[in-house]
Amino acid sequence: MSSLRRLLLLLLLVFPATLLLRVGPGGSLAVAQDLTEDEETVEDSIIEDEDDEAEVEEDEPTDLAEDKEEDDVSGEPEASPSADTTILFVKGEDFPANNIVKFLVGFTNKGTEDFIVESLDASFRYPQDYQFYIQNFTALPLNTVVPPQRQATFEYSFIPAEPMGGRPFGLVINLNYKDLNGNVFQDAVFNQTVTIIEREDGLDGETIFMYMFLAGLGLLVVVGLHQLLESRKRKRPIQKVEMGTSSQNDVDMSWIPQETLNQINKASPRRLPRKRAQKRSVGSDE
């Protein structure tokens, strides 16, 4: 029993000593080394982030420059400062659907070199987005040379589609020309939102069909009434009118007594006036 107690006391003394030796100065060094390694990794990550931000800041100006260059390359040609254009709509700025719209474009060369007017085109576009074409008309080839200090006039006409009536659209009219050096120019002579007017004059297909339908309906009504009247006339019974007897021979006189017949014959109106007339004539002679 005493030996067991001694062993337990020895273990109790040895075990804390071993723990102190393991976690002592060596353990603190390990923890310190771990902390320094973590700090180094954090500092390295911060430095890398700063380098990335610097690279992004350096790349931004180059990207903007590239975007500007792309815009310059992909952008449409502009008008030349040495040229001037005007437009005149022949029938005013009214655009009736399914009707001819005609306008004149004047070109003035104010420079010292010749300009070659190549073509004239027009198109209807979506009002909210002019990049979306609604109706694109055929370009008119011109190929006309305009000398310096000279003017030229060009005529163009188009027909708005009938379904576009009553709606607003963007009308774009472009005049394309170039100089002798090959520089291409484009002048937007007209670039505004216009409203297509619905045609009210004349007869369209729907109106003609409606009139024909009404005429046919009226004809059917007339024919029906005529047939109804004819059928009613046929159904009416013929009323018999009593005509009476035209002569006494048609009357059966056998049932009348003979004496009565003799009196009737004696007092007949045809014979009495004659007898009276004869008596009067005899009396006058006397």
UniProtKB/Swiss-Prot annotation:
Keyword Transmembrane tagged: yes
Cytoplasmic membrane side: 229-286
Pfam families: TRAP_alpha
Glycosylation-annotated residues: 136, 191
Topology in the lipid bilayer: Single-pass type I membrane protein
Transmembrane segments: 208-228
Bias (Basic residues): 268-279
Region described as Disordered: spans on this chain: 37-83, 261-286
Signal peptide coordinates: 1-20
Bias (Acidic residues): 37-75
Residues modified as Phosphoserine: 247, 268
InterPro entries for the chain: TRAP_alpha (IPR005595)
Membrane side Lumenal: residue ranges: 21-207
Predominant subcellular localization, coarse grouping: endoplasmic reticulum
Subcellular location: Endoplasmic reticulum membrane
Role played: TRAP proteins are part of a complex whose function is to bind calcium to the ER membrane and thereby regulate the retention of ER resident proteins. May be involved in the recycling of the translocation apparatus after completion of the translocation process or may function as a membrane-bound chaperone facilitating folding of translocated proteins.
Assembly notes: Heterotetramer of TRAP-alpha, TRAP-beta, TRAP-delta and TRAP-gamma. Interacts with palmitoylated calnexin (CALX), the interaction is required for efficient folding of glycosylated proteins.
Domain notes: Shows a remarkable charge distribution with the N-terminus being highly negatively charged, and the cytoplasmic C-terminus positively charged.
Recorded family membership: Belongs to the TRAP-alpha family.
Misc. remarks from the entry: Seems to bind calcium.
PANTHER family, A to Z: TRANSLOCON-ASSOCIATED PROTEIN SUBUNIT ALPHA (PTHR12924:SF0), TRANSLOCON-ASSOCIATED PROTEIN, ALPHA SUBUNIT (PTHR12924)
The name this protein goes by in its record: Translocon-associated protein subunit alpha
Designated gene of the protein: SSR1
